[in-house]
């Protein structure tokens, strides 16, 4: 019997991913207004980033300068093209387009910047993959409107979406609405809730009820944006985006199995609504059981049904094991009941390294939704050492990515998952979202910038640069 070797599709989208606030810098250039990430201080592993009410003198805000993609984008895109990128995921900084968020007219200088950047990508046949909201909400909307707790913000977001859809309708095909929207489930950790929504949930009398009200507004905004995109250009594809951390039961104890299932369901509600178009019974039962009053307007449920997303983008970095009783993790970490998994290793930041978990995640998501999937974040944050000759031998990053790509290929060629592409996170070094560090590096491209703010921003290729170039050229066959 002849066994045919299956490969990834020829149109598979290989590339890399970043977010505007982590790479662009130029926080007050070109008419840009302050966003919620512009008031996040630097931090470190074990030292949380501080959220300030405004930009304060004497505080260090690494996102203000980031790695100056705003001034280096042509140089950086040329390097992406050298690697052979088929696509590049980034976000449009909302406050470059609407500096306060509630203006009637957009900022033309901001629109022109993205025109130029997209043109530069398309010059090299690199498809832009664009997130509308990647932790970049206008600070003014937080201060004056209470952020997404206020229904008016739905209209402001939809106006922003319509403006950029119309402006870039012939330049950008792939969009996503909200980045890692489900990280609000970690509402006890202020950073996650704040960056996803502009809300510090712990300041509210009933944090979880507030979270669900915020989410309803975001779900409606996402659905209205999807409907607008289809009206403006039916060829555009709009996805939702999930932070996918599969939770394994620590044992076959039925209590552990049930606890893992319930914990995953708390995260799936975000994509259940955006992909299926309705609130699942398990969350409606929770609201009734706990006496939550989620305010909805007439027609909202119709909007959710009519504005389902075209595909599911997700990030994958790790798995966690959980148990019903005796877990060492806490609710603040977002993984209540978690315990160390003895079968996998961990990174310097404690993230469990589990390549097989990526295949598991792909199968779980595809079987649940039967929609195209897109791995829009996956990567290995590490301290990189620059040798005396200038080389950076990041074999650990190559090993991590190789193992994950191998499992990704199995999901496509064995399991039949419909996978659009793969964009490793931080393809160029950037400011870490969770810690505000430069030293937590992910990139194929090294940026000479350091946690104390020093460095000349020069770019250089790591060993992984040429490795990934060969991976793309061989469509994943040469690992």
From Swiss-Prot:
PROSITE patterns: GLYCOSYL_HYDROL_F1_1, GLYCOSYL_HYDROL_F1_2
Biological process, per Gene Ontology: carbohydrate catabolic process
Coiled coil regions in record: none
Any Pfam family: Glyco_hydro_1
Residues annotated as catalytic: 180, 377
Enzyme class, first EC level, given as a word: hydrolase
Disulphides: none
Induction of its expression: Constitutively expressed.
Protein's UniProt keywords contain RNA-binding: no
UniProt keyword annotations, A-Z: Glycosidase, Hydrolase
Transmembrane parts of this sequence: none
Gene Ontology CC annotations of this record: cytosol
The name this protein goes by in its record: 6-phospho-beta-glucosidase BglA
Organism encoding this protein: Escherichia coli (strain K12)
């Amino acid at each position: 019997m002849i066994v045919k070797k299956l490969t990834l599709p020829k149109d598979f989208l290989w590339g890399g991913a970043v977010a505007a606030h982590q790479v662009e810098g130029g926080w007050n250039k070109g008419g840009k207004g302050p966003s919620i990430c512009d008031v996040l201080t630097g931090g470190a592993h074990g030292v949380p980033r501080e959220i300030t009410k405004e930009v304060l003198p004497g505080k260090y805000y690494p996102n203000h300068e980031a790695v100056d993609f705003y001034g280096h984008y042509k140089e950086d895109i040329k390097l992406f093209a050298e690697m052979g990128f088929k696509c590049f995921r980034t976000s449009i900084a909302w406050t470059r387009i609407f500096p306060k968020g509630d203006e009637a007219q957009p900022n033309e200088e901001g629109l022109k910047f993205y025109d130029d950047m997209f043109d530069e990508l398309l010059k090299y046949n690199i498809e832009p993959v664009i997130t509308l909201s990647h932790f970049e909400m206008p600070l003014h909307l937080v201060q004056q409107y209470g952020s997404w707790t206020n229904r008016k913000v739905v209209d402001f977001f939809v106006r922003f979406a319509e403006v950029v859809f119309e402006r870039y309708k012939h330049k950008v095909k792939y969009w996503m609405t909200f980045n890692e929207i489900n990280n609000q489930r970690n509402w006890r950790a202020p950073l996650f809730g704040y960056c996803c929504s502009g809300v510090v949930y712990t300041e509210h009398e009933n944090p979880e009820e507030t979270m669900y009200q915020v989410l309803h507004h975001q779900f409606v905004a996402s659905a209205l944006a999807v409907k607008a995109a289809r009206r403006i250009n039916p060829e555009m594809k709009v996805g939702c985006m999930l932070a996918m951390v599969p939770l394994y039961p620590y044992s076959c104890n039925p209590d552990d199995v049930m606890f893992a299932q319930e914990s995953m369901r708390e995260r799936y509600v975000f994509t259940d609504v955006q992909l299926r178009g309705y609130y699942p019974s398990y969350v409606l039962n929770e609201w009734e059981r706990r006496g939550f009053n989620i305010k909805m307007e007439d027609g909202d449920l119709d909007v959710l049904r009519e504005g389902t997303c075209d595909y599911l983008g997700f990030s994958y970095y790790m798995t966690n094991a959980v148990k019903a009783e005796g877990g060492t993790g806490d609710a603040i970490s977002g993984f209540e009941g978690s315990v160390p998994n003895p079968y996998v290793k961990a990174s310097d930041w404690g993230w469990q390294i589990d390549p097989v978990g990526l295949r598991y995640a792909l199968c779980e998501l595809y079987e649940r939704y039967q929609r195209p999937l897109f791995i829009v974040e996956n990567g290995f944050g590490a301290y990189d050492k620059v040798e005396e000759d200038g080389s950076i031998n990041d074999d650990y990053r190559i090993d991590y990515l190789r193992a994950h790509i191998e499992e990704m290929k199995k999901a496509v060629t064995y399991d039949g998952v419909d996978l659009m592409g793969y964009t490793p996170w931080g393809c160029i070094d950037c400011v870490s979202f969770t810690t505000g560090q430069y030293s937590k590096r992910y990139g194929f491209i090294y940026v000479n910038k350091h946690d104390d703010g020093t460095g000349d921003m020069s770019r250089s290729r790591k060993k992984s640069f040429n490795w990934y170039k060969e991976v793309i050229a061989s469509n994943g066959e040469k690992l």
